[in-house]
């Protein structure tokens, strides 16, 4: 039935060759337009049918025809601030046979506005400008402009003037409308969209999304944006469907109004960029009792900026609670030059979650367009599958030139006719497009490219309370004489100007986030009021304009004031070393980090100062040399007290008494709150492996749990049960009640699973439970091993030896006694790595003893029971554990599905099992891990 309706409709519109014919065809349907307006602070609606629109446009076309000086080549520039006026006068110009150009909203800066108006006057060959009387002052009295207000036209035009409606004679290849680009990279360009191009595009959209006659369309974006014109207005026309229009201000003041209108009009198709989806999500979650019937909704198109998968996932869940039947969020790619959206995903967020994507895939092309990715390093060559490169498009829906701008046209196309979009992306194995930022929004620091989009998302994902979301801009800056670009971050502060603590904390978190990803701190960090960060109608901020303002000195006074406040606050909170132990710790850090003593605050985290997991042990050695009298410093003292002052106090305490065992190691104690993350050690029992991961959570408390046995007089655990009870108890001492977030790495996955069961049995919620690359069934991996095998695995895990060496040396090592075996491993192993870890035979033996104790405790272990939630993170397995990653995931890790009440989520991660949390892979792993946590709501 549906197929026959579609075919009949396709045949009825297939003969249309221009937009005037399209409106005439639609006038014979029952469809029409509903316009909302606010009068006396009351929102009211008016409906006009397509037949009425045709008649009204015909009358207005007669009025345009009476303007003196018009020719068949004249351009009519339309500048209105309501959707109804733009639509009515657009069709008037179209029916009359003139070329309409739709003006964009003007900027407040009068100097820039004047330059823009004069540029358009020249570029569009002295167009006739139509506007409303109330908007005439916006044109600054420029005498050059051929300006007409429509109220005067209506009152002065002859009543009996005749006009030939030349619009119906237009050919498919004739230009139908000029759409203006945002001008984000300079002066606005005019994009000619042809009649046939537009008709092909809207039919391609309809085919791709399965829209049908009778589907209701809803728009809240100005008609100056190509998505409003093509995605909604013309798309609805070609189906003879109703379309609803409201001003953006109605929704931005109350995003629930969007959902109410979808319900009221039983909307099937609408549009919203990511920033507005976030507003809708927040409103729905803040109003859980809000009801709506959204069962008619088929497609919620989203474009203009990258869609965050977590947002799409959470919003999809909220929409389903209100009647939506399927996945309706359709992230897409489009430009003015491609008649708006022309590449869309139809499987968001499920596809993106399966692929562990942070930003939603953009799917495939509509009929009428093709895409390709070209290599950046080898110009003219196609990029390999999955390789990031330059996105280029071609096809009937793509424009072929910029109006009156030969230079821009020449630079926009390849020799073989493909349009260079300026975007970076890759096409995955399923043929779906994924974007990686704009070529001009790329920052190159010391030869390494970084995407502004990714850095901005990383900053905002930390949910920094001190900044306003969606107003963060990262741009390159290059000081005179600098050998490389540097990173500048501009943000809009949410804190009060006099809240110096919030200002300082916000700057610290932003700086740390950027540093973790790029290895360098922002060279410039500037808090700007929102009024200085202008957004387009789709919520985009022009990076090039921000950079130009930054480098021209427009922000200089704000930047200087901010730097002065931060310097004063740092001085205020700086605490010098006072005791002998504090001075010893400070001296050790000065020598170790090569920083001045005045740069070391006794209350700052040593990790913020630059200490990493790899050099933590070397710091301990340096510190032991500085102390007088000499004492042995357990690593736990540094791990448990990660500030210089706390380390000094702990040293003083340890001189007089023996510290008791504490499993909890604070890796990141942050004031901003958030659900703490508890990380449970692998088989070695130590927690250094989590230090790098913790650094990627600048606004979340992170704790690791170490085993018993590393400290003096600490007895090893006697059983798994004792271990689990101890860990659960100590976790609750830090966080008395859930929701909890717990992760176990390698063999620690077993402990994490058992701890989660204990907490859930106590009535607590474990909202996020992670098994980092280890299966539920472990007994068969360990029961036939002995201490020597454990030593080999520890040496491999610590990267003293590689897997090939581990296999080759196994028979020989089993013939040696304990001390000889330990010595042999260090003799054949990586000596530099051993020095970095401060590993000698004694310490290597201790680690092996602890791991062997763990092996003995779990050699008869059988997993039982179920937890509520589970995420499994997958790396390449050791060869002794599985044939390959597929075998590891499906046949080993896949068994976790038997031990969870709900669906287990699997996440592919970079690297091999033993190195997946190392420096080379930690950024990629943290990205996947944090996305999984966000999807679980922690």
Curated annotation (Swiss-Prot):
Residues 581-652 are annotated as: Thiolation and peptide carrier (T) domain. It is an enzyme of class 2 (transferase). Belongs to the ATP-dependent AMP-binding enzyme family. GO terms for molecular function: CoA-ligase activity; phosphopantetheine binding; transferase activity. One of its GO terms (biological process) is (-)-microperfuranone biosynthetic process. It comes from the Eukaryota. The lineage of its organism: Eukaryota, Fungi, Dikarya, Ascomycota, Pezizomycotina. Coiled coil: none annotated. This is Microperfuranone synthase. Its EC number is 2.3.1.-. The modification O-(pantetheine 4'-phosphoryl)serine is found at residue 613. Microperfuranone synthase is the only protein required for the biosynthesis of the secondary metabolite microperfuranone from phenylpyruvic acid (PPA). Several steps for the microperfuranione biosynthesis have been proposed. These steps include the activation of PPA, by the micA adenylation (A) domain to AMP-phenylpyruvic acid followed by loading of the PPA unit to the thiolation and peptide carrier (T) domain and eventually transferring to the thioesterase (TE) domain. Pathway: Secondary metabolite biosynthesis. InterPro entries: AB_hydrolase_fold (IPR029058), ACP-like_sf (IPR036736), AMP-bd_C_sf (IPR045851), AMP-binding_CS (IPR020845), AMP-dep_synth/lig_dom (IPR000873), ANL_N_sf (IPR042099), PKS_PP-bd (IPR020806), PKS_thioesterase (IPR020802). Residues 579-655 form the Carrier domain. Gene3D superfamilies: 3.30.300.30, ACP-like, alpha/beta hydrolase, N-terminal domain of ligase-like.
């Amino acid at each position: 039935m549906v197929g026959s309706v579609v075919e009949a409709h396709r045949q009825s519109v297939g003969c249309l060759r221009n937009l005037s014919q399209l409106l005439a065809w639609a006038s014979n349907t029952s469809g029409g337009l509903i316009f909302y307006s606010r009068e006396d602070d009351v929102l009211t609606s008016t409906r006009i049918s397509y037949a009425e629109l045709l008649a009204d446009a015909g009358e207005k076309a007669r009025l345009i025809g009476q303007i003196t000086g018009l020719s068949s080549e004249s351009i009519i520039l339309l500048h209105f601030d309501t959707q109804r006026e733009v639509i009515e006068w657009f069709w008037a110009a179209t029916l009359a046979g003139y070329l309409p150009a739709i003006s964009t909203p003007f900027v407040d800066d009068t100097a820039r506005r004047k330059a823009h108006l004069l540029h358009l006057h020249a570029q569009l060959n002295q167009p006739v400008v139509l506007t409303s009387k109330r908007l005439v002052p916006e044109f600054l009295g420029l005498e050059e402009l051929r300006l007409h207000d429509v109220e005067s036209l209506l009152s002065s035009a002859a009543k009996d003037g005749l006009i030939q409606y030349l619009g119906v004679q237009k050919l498919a290849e004739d230009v139908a409308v000029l759409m203006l680009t945002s001008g984000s990279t300079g002066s606005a360009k005019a994009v000619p969209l042809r009649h046939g191009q537009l008709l092909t595009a809207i039919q391609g959209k309809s085919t791709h999304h399965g829209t049908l006659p009778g589907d209701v369309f809803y728009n809240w974006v100005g008609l100056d944006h190509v998505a409003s014109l093509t995605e909604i207005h013309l798309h609805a026309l070609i189906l003879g469907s109703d379309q609803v229009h409201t001003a953006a201000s109605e929704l931005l003041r109350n995003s629930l109004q969007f959902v109410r209108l979808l319900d009221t009009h039983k909307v099937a198709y609408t549009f919203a960029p990511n920033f507005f989806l976030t507003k809708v999500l927040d409103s729905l979650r803040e109003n859980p009792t809000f009801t709506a019937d959204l069962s008619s909704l088929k497609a919620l198109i989203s474009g203009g900026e990258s869609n965050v998968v977590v947002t799409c996932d959470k919003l999809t869940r909220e929409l389903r609670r209100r009647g939506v039947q399927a996945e309706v969020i359709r992230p897409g790619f489009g430009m003015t030059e491609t008649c708006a959206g022309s590449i869309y995903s139809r499987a968001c967020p499920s596809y993106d979650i399966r692929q562990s994507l942070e930003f939603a895939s953009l799917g495939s092309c509509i009929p009428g367009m093709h895409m390709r990715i070209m290599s950046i390093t080898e110009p003219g060559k196609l990029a390999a599958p999955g390789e990031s490169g330059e996105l280029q498009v071609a096809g009937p829906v793509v424009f072929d030139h910029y109006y009156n701008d030969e230079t821009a046209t020449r630079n926009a196309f390849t020799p073989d006719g493909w349009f260079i979009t300026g975007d970076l992306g890759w096409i995955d194995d399923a043929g779906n497009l994924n974007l990686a930022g704009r070529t001009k929004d790329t920052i190159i620091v010391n030869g390494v490219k970084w995407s502004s989009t990714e850095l901005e998302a990383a900053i905002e994902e930390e949910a920094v309370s001190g900044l306003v979301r969606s107003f963060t801009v990262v741009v390159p800056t290059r000081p005179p004489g600098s050998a490389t670009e540097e990173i500048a971050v501009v943000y809009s502060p949410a804190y009060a100007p006099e809240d110096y603590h919030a200002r300082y904390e916000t700057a610290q978190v932003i700086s740390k986030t950027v540093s973790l990803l790029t290895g360098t701190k922002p060279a410039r960090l500037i808090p700007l009021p929102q009024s200085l960060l202008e957004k387009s109608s789709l919520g985009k901020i022009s990076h090039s304009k921000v950079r130009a303002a930054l480098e021209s000195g427009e922000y200089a006074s704000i930047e200087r004031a901010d730097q002065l406040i931060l310097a004063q606050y740092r001085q205020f909170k700086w605490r010098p070393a006072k005791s002998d132990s504090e001075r010893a710790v400070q001296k050790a850090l000065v020598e170790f980090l090569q920083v001045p003593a005045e740069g070391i605050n006794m209350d700052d985290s040593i990790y913020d100062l630059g200490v990493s997991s790899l050099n933590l042990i070397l710091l301990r050695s340096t510190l032991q040399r500085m102390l007088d009298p000499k004492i042995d410093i357990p690593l736990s003292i540094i791990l448990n007290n990660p500030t210089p002052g706390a380390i000094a106090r702990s040293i003083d305490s340890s001189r007089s008494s023996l510290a008791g065992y504490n499993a909890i190691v604070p890796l990141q104690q942050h004031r901003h709150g958030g659900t703490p993350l508890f990380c449970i050690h692998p088989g070695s029992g130590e927690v250094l492996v989590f230090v790098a991961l913790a650094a990627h959570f600048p606004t979340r408390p992170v704790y690791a749990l170490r085993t018993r046995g590393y400290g003096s007089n600490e007895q090893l655990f006697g059983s798994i049960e004792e271990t689990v009870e101890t860990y659960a108890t100590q976790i609750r001492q830090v966080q008395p009640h859930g929701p909890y977030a717990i992760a176990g790495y390698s063999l620690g996955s077993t402990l994490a699973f058992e701890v989660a069961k204990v907490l859930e049995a106590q009535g607590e919620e474990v909202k996020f439970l992670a098994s980092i690359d280890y299966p539920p069934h472990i007994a068969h991996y360990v029961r036939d091993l002995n201490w020597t095998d454990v030593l080999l695995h520890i040496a491999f895990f610590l990267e003293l030896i590689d897997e090939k060496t581990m296999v080759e040396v196994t028979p020989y090592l089993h013939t040696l006694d304990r001390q000889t075996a330990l010595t042999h491993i260090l003799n054949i192993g990586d000596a530099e790595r051993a020095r970095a870890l401060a590993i000698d035979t004694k310490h290597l033996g201790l680690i092996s003893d602890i791991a062997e104790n763990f092996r003995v405790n779990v050699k008869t272990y059988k997993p039982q029971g179920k937890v509520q939630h589970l995420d499994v993170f997958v790396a390449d397995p050791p060869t002794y554990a599985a044939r390959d990653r597929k075998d590891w995931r499906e046949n080993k890790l896949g068994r976790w599905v038997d031990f969870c009440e709900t669906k287990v989520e699997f996440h592919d991660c970079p690297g091999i099992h033993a190195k997946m949390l190392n420096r080379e892979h930690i950024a990629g792993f943290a990205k996947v891990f944090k996305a999984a946590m966000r999807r679980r709501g922690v």
